[in-house]
Curated annotation (Swiss-Prot):
Residue span(s) of domain Ras-GEF: 353-582
Repeat is among the record's keywords: yes
Biased composition (Low complexity): 206-236, 275-296, 311-326, 591-612, 646-657, 1059-1087
PROSITE patterns attached to this UniProt entry: CNMP_BINDING_3, RASGEF_CAT, RASGEF_NTER
Naturally occurring in which organism (per UniProt): Dictyostelium discoideum
Name of this chain's protein: Cyclic GMP-binding protein D
Gene giving rise to this polypeptide: gbpD
Pfam families linked: GRAM, RasGEF, RasGEF_N
Domain GRAM: 940-1006
Biased amino acid composition, Polar residues: 297-310
Annotated Basic and acidic residues bias: 630-644
Location of the N-terminal Ras-GEF domain: 26-155
Length: 1312
């Protein structure tokens, strides 16, 4: 007798019922049963139990296989065999119609759960097809149609996009955009493809922005994303909805499981990897946010695809005849949106209300969550599920974006505004029932990076704090999210809701792991588990199924959000420590009543008031942020002139180092008044979206006010045309600014015939050791090979620009160029170096701005050399000599040999080519900041108060006492001014320098100013203030009277000697005072004696230069670095791509490579470079401006041309990788450098830095960087980290920017 699995009597071997439950209750009465008994019960009812059927197929793969179920269903459909028992045959005969109908219904559900692996199993497919063929014709056709449709729609378990090769340097900070794919099976009508831009298709048909999707269909679907309902391929659920009750202690168990999962996922490291192997664990990033939301920031799982590069289809025919050389199609590199315009004028900032932002975030997350299918959840391979990974990545990106937006703001007030804005966004998201968004924002606000910003949180209004507390109570983890689960039960069936995905995955993980699929004692199927999991899945999917939001997407808001920058989690943490350190020191300053007497720097320029309007402290001339009691509180008034109302000295700065004081004074006050904050109420809740908004950083230009300070001791000189201002070999000790007219800087570098012959037609071996391989030398050799006269390279310094800035970088270095007047009459301002250096000793912010300004000038000059070199390529009609000296020229104007340092470049500087008039940015002033405007207002009020001329500005101010009256002493260009208050009456005194006979110092921190009328005494708070103020005052006074500063020192020493003869004096103290004064005065005429900086963090040797970063200071900078290793031939930087990073070579060697053909960046900046192309078309499309004669430039090249002398070809090992933000669609970094049309400019070795030009200037990189040694290790530091670090530490910024200026000046000098 054949064993038939059905119609067996119920016993403990095949079914177990729950106690005290009527068996007539159906499956709810069953505790566990065998698979055959389950199918028997499921198919024997008159009406199929659709809810249990759907619930069963959610979890059936945990205890059986599709093939086993198919065999049982076929056996159930055909009935018992003839030799079965009579009872079995009789029972089947009675219910045959019901059974067969139910079996076919179950078959339809089963087919919908099959995946590609199942269809690829021959035995399973053949069993289904054979069974279908045995059915009646009408039923057979219907089932076959469903079967093949499901097979076509089936896909293998989705895999997340491969992460970008960690060795490829990102071209910009990550943005909200990231790449992902969506299967047509799970793609919702809302077009999930359109949620996140940056989607790169294989054929590169995407738009550059990625905002509009990949096709017109996507655009249309996005515009109509609210007009339909969302359907998901899920089983039919019971319409009843009940909240899942979770027992106590569940979260502790989950934390243990999740911790184990995170260790598997991340190897104990940070969150960034999603390559875990545990199929029953939830994504680390989402779950870690669930369990430690209020203890730490969610870990990041970033995919750095914030931009794209597409191939231009119009250029598909370029290089099509070259079969042996790497082909390069014309690549249209779109500069990132963060690139400021060339003229330095930023665009308008867009701003949106929190409600608009919350709505757009809701729409985008709705499109993502409605793409989820039940199979994404039940497969438990969440690390391979594309839709879950999209939501997980989105969750972490939003959380990181919130942190980035807050940390990027410089002042506590600004950070408080952003925090309030995000709390309002979260509140609107709660009203929209987007609880996933609420958790994204709360997860960031409760992270350690944001929660430590106490000074910012203290500025929140009570209304915002109450709102924040309500949100916390709603999403608190207390009672296993009791409040959140309760609010979900109130959501109506037709009301759209976006639940918190992390909690659902946590619940699913718990239910799956705490309820075994088979009972341990009887090995029967656990029916309770099926009900528990199906109920939870039903609750989750029912929240966003068959309903939709009624509002439509706002593309402006979407584009703004997707263009926002997202920083690395670890760097956010480090930057928040810097922010909190700055705010803590500021609070300490206020609590101690420290005014602004020791330094006047603050904000983005050199001087004189803090950002909150405070000035020189808490005396009668104090600065508004410190009152008469020295308690650090303001008077509540908007004192635009920086004056306070106190009558007594405030506390001193004991216990705070000079660096900390500088940090204090450079930071903004966190004690802004409530009245002032309420003035910004209208705009404070409109968040500015600039994804490219430049970070608060040291200004790269000097304002007119700063120029007035720097030119305090300057003199004006008028030169006629042709007059040589400075000549080669002369030692310059000043800096000059052109007031009117212009001068020419002539950089003459001659090459004798022997030097030129090294690269021209002699020597067949081509061993060119000992030759000058600089860019200018190559150009000169090629000019000699064409019998062209030598060309002197130079540039013009126009009105408002400066020259001679090298004197501030080096001491006693002879001039390497001639400075000649090139206009009818030229008026120059000669700025005294000694006074400026004396001022820099205390004005670190002004010093940093000045040296950054010089660095920018050097970077622009270097960039102009590169672009001019490119613009003159290929214009000669004669070919140059080959790299081996064989002179086999070609008509394209380029040598045909492999690229080496001595490659012939052809007629680079043909006389018929106009040189580019590169206008340097030293005359372009940035838009004045609010702080600049405030300072200008203070100067205006100050001039009015003392009746001074309009050219007067406050250089320094000090708290002091005069005639028993506390006040403030101001040092200006022409006067000493004292402002005090006695018995409520203001006392103002002005002492012109030109009416002063002498300035001396005496005991007890007293400086005496002698005039014809009488001697005035000013008592400073400290010796440091006295020495600093005295040194600056003597410099200005001596300049007014043309007195030698050393004579003043001798007078002071004579006075001290006379005083020493009196018994009442203390000789030791006077000698100490004399020594201090001598140091102060000598510092006014020489560079401040700072110890030489060790050679740490740099390769160039600047051992004779002072005021460079020390070893400890370099360690501060290198804290934000990331080490990466590259192999020989790999390209670290691609020309034309913007890199918001700086790099340092730790080990190995790299070659700086310049393309001989204009890059798209060159064409965008200088659209006149290619005006002489053979196709003189008048269109302005720079990306297609290459002439047709250049299409075959690569046809004559040799095989495997290399940019290295050893002829090793460029490695293509990373051909499948992409550069973040710059390259996509299968393009590798190697395809961006054409070895035939490139030349090595220089070599960089251990310790060298690069990327400094991109750090100082906007736009893409001017050169490429290629690894030339076997291996190179580099440190990478993000520019935003460096900007914030330097902005918060002006004393370090001054040294760092001076170092950058020295590096760039050296490179310019080597190329000219």
């Amino acid at each position: 007798m054949t064993d038939y699995p059905f119609y067996k009597p119920d016993d403990e071997t095949n079914i177990i019922y729950n106690i005290n439950i009527n068996k007539k209750e159906g499956f709810s009465a069953i505790k566990s049963c065998s698979l055959a008994k389950l199918i028997e019960k499921l198919t024997s009812t008159k009406q199929l139990h659709t809810y249990f059927s759907s619930a069963f197929f959610l979890t059936y793969r945990d205890f059986t296989t599709p093939l086993e179920i198919i065999n049982l269903l076929i056996s159930r459909y055909t009935g018992p065999p003839p030799d079965s028992s009579k009872d079995s045959l009789r029972l089947f005969e009675i219910e045959v119609d019901i059974v067969q109908a139910n079996v076919l219904s179950i078959f339809r559900t089963l087919i919908g759960t099959l995946i590609q692996v199942d269809f690829d199993t021959p035995k399973l497919s053949s069993s289904i097809i054979e069974f279908f063929n045995s059915l009646p014709e009408s039923v057979k056709n219907e089932l076959f149609l469903e079967f093949f449709k499901a097979k076509k729609m089936a896909r293998p378990p989705g895999s997340i996009p491969k992460p970008v090769n960690s060795n490829i340097i990102s071209s910009a900070a990550s943005t909200m955009r990231f790449s992902y794919s969506v299967s047509p099976k799970t793609q919702s009508p809302n077009s999930t493809n359109n949620v996140l831009s940056g989607l790169l298709s294989n054929n590169g048909s995407n738009t550059m922005n990625g905002i509009n999707g990949t096709s017109n269909n996507n655009v249309n679907s996005n515009n109509n994303n609210n007009n339909g309902t969302t359907n998901i391929s899920s089983p039919n659920f019971d319409p009843s909805r009940s909240s899942m009750k979770m027992g106590k202690g569940i979260m502790k168990l989950l934390q243990s499981n999740i911790a184990n999962f995170n260790n598997q996922q991340n190897g104990g490291g940070g969150g960034g990897s999603n390559n875990g192997t545990s199929p029953q664990s939830s994504p680390s990033s989402t779950l870690s946010s669930t369990n430690s939301l209020f203890n730490q920031q969610p870990s990041l799982s970033m995919l750095n695809d914030d931009g794209s590069v597409q191939n231009n289809n119009n250029n598909n025919n370029n290089n099509n005849n070259n079969n042996n050389v790497n082909e390069i199609s014309t690549i249209n590199v779109q500069l990132p949106p963060s690139t400021p315009p060339i003229n330095g004028i930023p665009g308008e900032k867009t701003a949106f209300l929190p409600e608009a932002i919350a709505k757009e975030l809701t729409i985008m997350e709705w499109e993502l969550i409605t793409a989820l299918s039940v199979s994404d959840i039940t497969s438990k391979e969440w690390n391979k599920s594309v839709n879950i990974q999209n939501l997980t990545t989105w969750f972490n990106r939003i959380s990181s974006w919130v942190s980035t937006k807050i940390i990027s703001k410089e002042t506590p007030e600004e950070r408080a505004i952003i925090i309030e804005a995000f709390i309002n966004i979260a509140n609107f998201a709660k009203e929209l029932k987007n609880y996933n968004c609420v958790m994204e924002i709360l997860g960031s606000l409760h992270g350690s990076s944001i929660s430590r910003l106490k000074s910012s949180w203290a500025l929140l209004s009570q209304k915002t704090n109450d709102m924040f507390q309500i949100l916390n109570n709603l999403m608190t983890t207390d009672g296993n999210f009791k409040n959140y689960r309760k609010i979900l039960t109130t959501v109506l069936p037709n009301e759209p809701c976006i639940p918190y995905l992390g909690l659902f995955l946590t619940d699913y993980t718990y239910l799956d792991e705490s309820n075994p699929s088979l009972s341990t004692d009887s090995n029967l199927i656990n029916i309770d588990r099926i009900f528990l999991i199906s109920t939870r899945v039903q609750e989750f999917f029912q929240l966003f199924t068959n309903c939709n939001y009624t509002f439509i997407s706002n593309m402006s808001v979407r584009d703004a959000i997707l263009g926002e920058k997202v920083w690395d989690e670890n760097e956010i943490f480090r930057l928040s420590k810097i922010r909190e350190e700055t705010s803590s020191l500021q609070s300490l300053k206020e609590s101690n009543g420290i005014g602004n007497s020791n330094s006047t720097s603050g904000g983005s320029s050199s001087s004189l008031v803090n950002k909150d309007g405070s000035g020189g402290g808490g005396g009668s001339g104090g600065g508004g942020s410190v009152n008469s009691k020295g308690d650090g509180k303001g008077d509540g008034k908007d004192n635009r002139d920086g004056r306070g109302d106190g009558n007594s000295n405030c506390g001193n700065g004991s216990g705070i180092s000079s660096k900390d004081k500088d940090l204090l004074l450079s930071s903004s006050s966190s004690a802004a008044s409530h009245t002032v904050r309420r003035k910004n109420f209208v705009t404070k809740y409109r968040m500015s979206f600039t994804g490219n908004d430049p970070l608060p950083s040291v200004s790269s230009t000097l304002s007119e006010r700063e120029w007035k300070i720097l030119t305090t001791n300057s003199k004006t000189i008028i030169y006629p045309r042709g007059k040589t201002v400075l000549s080669v070999g002369e030692t310059n000790t000043n800096i000059y600014r052109v007031i009117s007219g212009r001068v020419k800087v002539e950089t003459l570098k001659s090459f004798n015939s022997s030097d030129a012959d090294l690269g021209a037609g002699g020597g067949g071996g081509g061993d060119n050791r000992g030759e000058d391989n600089s860019l200018m030398a190559i150009k000169a050799r090629n000019r000699l090979s064409l019998n062209l006269p030598a060309q002197d390279d130079g540039y013009y310094v126009e009105e408002g620009e400066i020259f001679g800035q090298e004197s501030f970088l080096y001491t006693d270095r002879p001039m390497l160029s001639n400075i000649i007047v090139d206009s009818g009459e030229c008026e120059l301002m000669e700025i005294e170096k000694s006074f400026v250096l004396q001022l820099f000793a205390s004005e670190h912010q002004l010093s940093a701005t000045f040296y950054k300004f010089i660095g920018v000038i050097q970077a622009q000059l270097l960039k102009s050399i590169y672009i001019n070199f490119t613009s003159n390529y290929g214009n000669g009609g004669s070919g140059g000599s080959g790299s081996n000296g064989n002179g086999g020229g070609s008509s394209n104007g380029a040598g045909g040999g492999g690229l080496s340092s001595s490659v012939s470049i052809g007629n680079l500087n043909s006389p018929n080519i106009n040189r580019i008039d590169f206008k340097r940015r030293s005359t372009i002033f940035e838009t004045p900041s609010s702080l600049d405007i405030l300072r200008d207002g203070n100067d205006s009020s100050f001039r009015t108060k003392f009746g001074l001329s309009q050219d007067e500005v406050i250089i320094k101010r000090y708290q002091c006492k005069h005639n028993n009256m506390n006040g403030t002493l101001y040092i200006t260009k022409h006067n000493l001014c004292f402002e005090g208050k006695f018995l409520g009456i203001n006392k103002n005194k002005t002492i012109p320098f030109d009416r002063t006979d002498k300035i001396l110092t005496v005991d007890k921190n007293i400086m005496t100013v002698t005039t014809k009328e009488k001697v005035k005494k000013f008592t400073f708070k400290s010796h440091d203030d006295l020495n600093e103020g005295y040194g600056i005052s003597v410099q200005i006074w001596a300049n007014h009277l043309n007195i030698n500063v050393k004579q003043q020192l001798q007078l002071q020493q004579q006075q001290l000697q006379q005083q020493q003869q009196q018994p009442s004096q203390q000789p030791s103290q006077q000698q100490s005072q004399s020594s201090q004064l001598q140091q102060s005065v000598s510092a006014s005429s020489t560079t401040p004696p700072v110890p030489n900086s060790p050679k740490v963090g740099r390769g160039e040797s600047f051992s004779n230069i002072k005021d460079l970063p020390s070893k400890d200071e370099w360690n501060q900078i290198l804290k934000g670095t990331k080490p990466l290793t590259f192999k020989k031939g790999e390209i670290l930087i691609c020309e034309g791509v913007e890199y918001q990073k700086m790099f340092q070579i730790v080990k190995g060697e790299c070659s700086v490579v310049k393309s001989l053909l204009p890059t798209p960046l060159d064409q965008n900046i200088f659209n006149n470079i290619n005006n002489n192309n053979n196709n003189n078309n008048n269109n302005n499309n720079n990306n297609n401006n290459n002439n047709n004669n250049n299409n075959n430039n690569n046809n004559n090249g040799n095989n495997n041309n290399s940019i290295f002398k050893n002829n090793s070809s460029i490695s293509n090992t990373n051909s499948n990788t992409s550069i973040d933000g710059g390259v996509g669609g299968g393009l590798s970094p190697q395809t961006l450098v054409d070895p035939k049309n490139s030349v090595i400019v220089s070599k960089l070795t251990h310790g060298s830095i690069f990327g400094e030009m991109s750090f100082l200037l906007p736009g893409g990189s001017a050169t490429s960087l290629v690894v030339s040694s076997d291996e190179v290790e580099v440190y990478i530091i993000e520019s935003y980290f460096l900007h914030i670090l330097l902005k918060s530490k002006p004393y370090l910024a001054s040294k760092f920017y001076k170092y950058l200026a020295c590096v760039l000046e050296t490179r310019v000098r080597n190329l000219t």
